[in-house]
Amino acid sequence: MAAQASEKLQKLDLNGQSGDAEADAPAAGQTQAGEAEDDSDDDEVEDGNAAGEGAASGGGAKVQSSPPRVPLSTLFAGKEYPEGEIVEYQNENSYRTTNEEKRYLDRMKNDFLQEYRQAAEVHRQVRQYAQKTIKPGQTLTEIAEGIEESVRALTGHQGLEEGDNLKGGMGFPCGLSINHCAAHYTPNAGNKMVLQQGDVMKVDFGAHINGRIVDSAFTVAFDPVYDPLLAAVKDATNTGIREAGIDVRMSDIGAAIQEAMESYEVEINGTMYPVKCIRNLNGHNIDQHIIHGGKSVPIVKGGDQTKMEEGEVFAIETFGSTGKGYVREDMETSHYALIPDHSQVPLRLSSAKNLLNVINKNFGTLPFCRRYLDRLGQDKYLLGLNNLVSSGIVQDYPPLCDIKGSYTAQYEHTIVLRPNVKEVISRGDDY
């Protein structure tokens, strides 16, 4: 979920507190028995439903259903989840890989890592199904709700009982931002928007276990003309991941990302466009139950001398555009989040008081959208919600858009700066 780099980020000022898997743990993106794949969508769904029914009846399904509905606790009975991509530290930090003290500290964080790895495996399985099934002609509501239902099923938390969503489920709403819209768009109730053949759609969603949020995103485009745009952003994100590490300055990461991104260009309808970094969108660190932890990872060169630190978790995300490379708020807001340590403002509207109670009990500081309030049976809440926003208790996240007619793309991964290695926790075979 993108962090906006300008006055919006300063306005947020979000703050939060922020051994190894067994050698025979399965590789990232695979279940213990391996994923069953089939080129036939009909066969997949039929077999998948049978697998899901078997799991529900105690049959102990060992493959994921299609669509994904089998809880990971069924697939990984030993509760040891796949590691992400392990990257050894380089240069002055290379000693950390073999340092016994650092390895010991790393082993002490096994519960923390298992929660992150479980959330990451949920994300991998859900997104890999989504990548195979998202097609032109689908409504955005159908796509978003399908992804969200899968995440809830795999985490084992439907989020309909008070406090259940705080234990696991959606880390933030499924963003489906199309073409010039770069981030923070998800359909509200009644939205009839349909995905088109020529669209470029960013799919950005989070899965969490106990507030350990895995934030990862990819871009869907059906026309190969956009391939260079997607390649630029994927390269830039991987460059940011490569450069990130303990004691690395944010400014150095941003400079490397920009150099990678802006070495690409894309030809659309006979016109050549340079791929530009969207300079006011950033990556960010992640704290427990808080998606934007207060530190920003720029995607352009600049003067931020803040350093990454041991034990921190970061979402490394980059955005490329054929437009101005700058986004502004536009369109109807759908994303919201309770501001951590918000000021205690007396609320005069009973609807605002009641809604704040619902938010605290069901989402805490996790982002939510209007559809999630609808799902909980809330109605006529918009006046109260706007009052919470104007009172500085809830932050709104309007869609962020470049100029109309432009195309934007996004790729994102979550990394954990472990004491002895860097783990790209959300890495998969897909990206």
Curated annotation (Swiss-Prot):
The chemistry this enzyme catalyses reads: Release of N-terminal amino acids, preferentially methionine, from peptides and arylamides
**Annotated region (Disordered), positions in chain:** 1-76
What SUPFAM superfamilies does the annotation carry? Creatinase/aminopeptidase (SSF55920), Winged helix' DNA-binding domain (SSF46785)
Which residues does UniProt assign to the signal peptide? none
Bias regions of kind Acidic residues — which residues?
A: 35-47
Q: In the record's cofactor note, how is the cofactor described as bound?
A: Binds 2 divalent metal cations per subunit. Has a high-affinity and a low affinity metal-binding site. The true nature of the physiological cofactor is under debate. The enzyme is active with cobalt, zinc, manganese or divalent iron ions. Most likely, methionine aminopeptidases function as mononuclear Fe(2+)-metalloproteases under physiological conditions, and the catalytically relevant metal-binding site has been assigned to the histidine-containing high-affinity site.
Q: Does the keyword NADP apply?
A: no
Q: Where does a divalent metal cation 1 bind?
A: D204, D215, E412
Gene Ontology CC terms, in alphabetical order: cytoplasm
HAMAP family per the UniProt record, alphabetical: MetAP_2_euk
Its protein name is: Methionine aminopeptidase 2-2
Give the source species.
Answer: Aspergillus niger (strain ATCC MYA-4892 / CBS 513.88 / FGSC A1513)
